[in-house]
């Protein structure tokens, strides 16, 4: 009963991780955040692998999911430090876009409660009188929105790590117990195969 509840909980966590990762992937695409896009894509693949391993009772796949959960926690801690500018990191840098574009987080302009103000741009930043749309009066700064997203991912990954380890341990114990019981088979296969060969040897020594 405990294993069933643990397995069902892990399935629910994997499903929830898929939903939240897809939601995050959409907004990272809108903001052209290439590093998070690659990380989210890898995360989605591994979560699907863990989901498959849990359904099909494949502990090796779940082990891959558990190892990735630790990596995913580390990545999201980095994202929190990046947006909260901890450890010398700056949210204004182009680290997450691989210096391919000057885009920022999508939540910077479209956060909850943000009002769009059009500011006339000049110099190299403007082309043919284009204007830059900036979010103003936001109910929550985009840095906190990104940090909350990462915090949710950390929470789900930690829970997935714990339940993944539990399911792997139970499956491994069941496999070991199955092999242990099979080792005491009173009629092993080699005994069955040994009997005809002994009869043939006896027949060879019989006088004609």
UniProtKB/Swiss-Prot annotation:
GO terms for cellular component: membrane; plasma membrane. Keywords: Cell membrane, Membrane, Transmembrane, Transmembrane helix. Pfam families: NKAIN. The keyword Membrane applies. Ubiquitous. Expressed in multiple regions of the brain such as cerebral cortex, thalamus, hippocampus, olfactory bulb and brainstem as well as in cerebellum with low expression in granular cell layer. Belongs to the NKAIN family. Interacts with ATP1B1. This is Sodium/potassium-transporting ATPase subunit beta-1-interacting protein 4. The lineage of its organism: Eukaryota, Metazoa, Chordata, Craniata, Vertebrata. The gene is Nkain4.
């Amino acid at each position: 009963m405990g294993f069933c509840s643990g397995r069902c909980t892990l399935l629910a966590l994997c499903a929830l991780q898929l939903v939240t990762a897809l939601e995050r992937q959409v907004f990272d695409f809108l903001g052209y955040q290439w590093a998070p896009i690659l990380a989210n894509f890898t995360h989605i693949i591994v979560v699907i692998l863990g989901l498959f391993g849990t359904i099909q009772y494949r502990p090796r796949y779940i082990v891959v999911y558990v190892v990735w959960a630790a990596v995913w926690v580390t990545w999201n801690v980095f994202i929190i430090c990046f947006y909260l500018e901890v450890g010398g990191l700056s949210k204004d840098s182009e680290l997450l876009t691989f210096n391919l574009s000057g885009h920022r987080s999508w939540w910077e302009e479209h956060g909850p409660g943000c009002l769009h103000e059009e500011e006339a741009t000049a110099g190299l930043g403007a082309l043919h009188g284009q204007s830059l749309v900036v979010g103003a009066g936001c109910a929550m700064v985009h840095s906190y929105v990104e940090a909350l997203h990462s915090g949710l991912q950390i929470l789900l990954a930690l829970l997935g790590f714990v339940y993944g380890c539990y399911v792997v341990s139970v499956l491994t114990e069941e496999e070991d117990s199955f092999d242990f019981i099979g080792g005491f088979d009173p009629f092993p296969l080699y005994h069955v195969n040994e009997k005809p060969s002994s009869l043939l040897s006896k027949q060879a020594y019989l006088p004609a």
